[in-house]
Design a protein with these regions (language model features):
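Hydrophobic anchor at the start of a short beta-strand
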Residues: 3, 46-47, 73, 150-151, ...
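Conserved beta-alpha-beta core of the PfkB/ribokinase-like small-molecule kinase fold
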Residues: 130-202, 220
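Short catalytic helix/loop segments, enriched in acidic residues and glycine
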Residues: 19-38
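Conserved N-terminal subdomain of the carbohydrate kinase-like
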Residues: 19-23, 45-130, 300-311
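Positively charged, low-complexity intrinsically disordered leader regions
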Residues: 1-20
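Active-site metal-binding loops of divalent metal-dependent hydrolases
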Residues: 7-9, 136, 157, 249
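Conserved phosphate-binding/catalytic region of the ribokinase-like
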Residues: 4, 193-311
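Structural motif
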Residues: 2-4, 129-130, 180, 211
């Protein structure tokens, strides 16, 4: 059994304000599904990414960030005619502004067409792979519908849901192979309104996952299984530097413990796993970046221009 993330790789580029200018200070791997994989790999789980990226410096950094955690990157396609996808985050205290456009040169560093095709996935996904997916992006929907593998799915944004009818949402999410479905509070409330219901338990009954997690930020999380809701309250970190990736790390712990416990869920198991997940997220938010708790990261020196123009 291995955990597998699909889709093109993404970088997180961090900047700080220097007077009226921006200064690039750090580049690391990003995107929820790959952050989940990184956390799983750091704890010794078998992991793989089937992906694509550019042959640029950013792509090299993102690949190295996974390889140093022993993630299998054998099936990553690198193309020389693209720049690796990148989010640009300007850090101000413990807050950040995120764009897909370089704040130094103004270039958009995000291509929309996937490098990797579903046919490529079919060649390399094994029947017992557990697929890590985030969001209902167009490239994820056929994977959810057609691949028989067990899947864990995190939906953190409502943007993609707006373009789907209620019937389409149900056709995607009422999938017997979705083992764990994680939503944040915004998505939960959006779906409750969409389906004209009033309670989380009704939403669980409509979507029919094996196990549902609803994260509520600093208020903690709700866990739903077998028509029961268990609420857990977070123990807060005293030193919060950056909350990027906290939800991904939290999710990774529940994924791992779910399978280690042979998919058995109990109140005691939720209590125990929540303590481990809470401790992990406390470490995540104490560092800059989603993976700062896993390794030192790539703090750049001697780069006088923006990363978009490097050769």
């Amino acid at each position: 059994m291995r955990y597998v993330a699909l889709g093109d790789l993404v970088a997180d580029c961090y900047y700080k304000n220097v007077g009226q200018d921006k200064e690039l200070i750090k580049i690391d791997g990003g995107s929820s599904r790959f952050n989940v994989i990184a956390n799983l790999a750091a704890r010794g789980n078998s992991t793989c990414v089937i992906s694509g990226c550019g042959q640029d410096l950013v792509g090299k950094i993102v690949l190295n960030s996974l390889m140093r955690l022993n993630v299998d990157t054998s099936f990553v396609i690198r193309k020389g005619n693209i720049r690796t996808r990148a989010y640009h985050l300007t850090v101000e205290g413990n807050k950040h502004i995120c764009t897909k456009t370089c704040p130094i040169c103004g270039n958009r560093t995000w291509y929309n067409q996937e490098v990797v095709t579903i046919e490529y996935y079919k060649k390399h996904i094994k029947k017992d792979d557990i697929l890590i997916l985030d969001g209902l992006k167009p490239e994820n929907i056929p994977i959810i519908k057609t691949f028989p593998n067990e899947k864990v799915l995190d939906i953190g944004r409502i943007k993609r849901l707006d373009g789907l009818s209620n019937t389409e949402i149900l056709n995607i999410l009422q999938n017997k192979n979705i083992e764990i479905l994680q939503l944040n509070e915004t998505v939960e409330q959006y779906l409750i309104r969409r389906f004209k219901i009033s309670k989380l338990l009704e939403l669980f009954q409509i979507l029919e996952p094996k196990f549902m997690i609803v994260t509520r930020g600093k208020e903690g999380a709700d866990f739903v299984t077998q028509n029961h809701i268990i609420h857990k309250t977070l123990i807060h970190c005293q030193k919060e530097v950056d909350d990027t990736g906290a939800g991904d790390a939290f999710f990774s712990m529940f994924i791992q413990k779910y399978y280690e416990n042979c998919k058995r869920i109990s109140r005691g198991w939720i209590d125990e796993t929540f303590l481990l997940a809470n401790d992990l997220t406390t470490r995540v938010v104490s560092h800059l970046g989603a993976r700062g708790h896993l390794y030192d990261g790539y703090y750049l020196k001697n780069i006088n221009n923006c990363i978009c123009k490097e050769d």
